[in-house]
Amino acid sequence: QAGRTIRYNLKYGGDYRFMSFRSLLLSGNMVDTQFCYHELPEKLDPFDNETFMHSKTKFYAVCSNVETGSPEYVLCRDMFKDIDFLRASASMPFVSQIVKAGGMKLLDGGITDSIPLTAAFKLGFERNIVVQTRPEGYRKKPARTGWLAKMFYGKYPKFVEAIKQRHLMYNRELDEIEQMRAARRVLVIRPSRSVKIGKMEPNPEIVREMYELGRYDAIAVLDSVKKFLQGDKNEKG
């Protein structure tokens, strides 16, 4: 469904239910659950779940278990039935309610495993492509939300600690990626330049700019991607 994501982002980005503080106040979630995870993919801009279910490609959602402070890697076979895991994987702390799914309490997987490359190798995937959202040289700084994490998630001390230590985990994963990239074990695609875009960017022009940059950078490395997936160990990205 090429173009679907940018299409619905631009079409519905101005709807308060899509992402807004108004939605947070009314529903407890910055991203309205019913609208974004049911009405939109089921009716307004239907997701082709039939093709997804018959695809040979495995799709995993990475979620953070707030009770254990560890990541959960959930194989999704039916996007409509497994939608709560997908929702949890994108539910940012502080602006989302904890998602209960599979007997677990879950939030954004990026808190406990921001770039799950090691997990991909452990799951048996040998030729991995890492798509980064930050340009080369980026390093994550310590967050100033430790006190907020304790206030929101005091019942879950391991998750609070994961939030406090996230920058260390993230930068360690960046180092591991560079080592694997140098050894030609992974191919890395990253933005060719910086774009000032917020996590909850409301400006459609900036969203479009980021999308077009992603397309441009992907096309630029397409031949390298093909060679890498075909097993050319000399291909370095």
Please tell me what each predicted stretch does.
Residues M53-V131, P135-K150, G231:
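Active-site gating loop/helix substructures
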Residues E173-G237:
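C-terminal helical/tail subdomains of lipid-metabolizing enzymes
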Residues Q1-K43, L75, F80-A88, Q132, ...:
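Patatin-like phospholipase
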Residues G14-L24, S64-S70, K158:
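Acidic/polar active-site rim loop that often engages polyanionic ligands
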Residues E126-R185:
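Helix-centered, glycine/charged polyanion-binding patches within enzymatic domains
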Residues S23-V31, S70-V74, M104-L107, E161-K164:
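Flexible, glycine/proline-enriched loop segments at strand-loop-helix junctions
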Residues P46, D113-S114, L174, P204:
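Structural motif corresponding to alpha-helix initiation and N-cap regions
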Residues V31-H54, L168-E176, R190-R193:
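C-terminal domain-closing interface element
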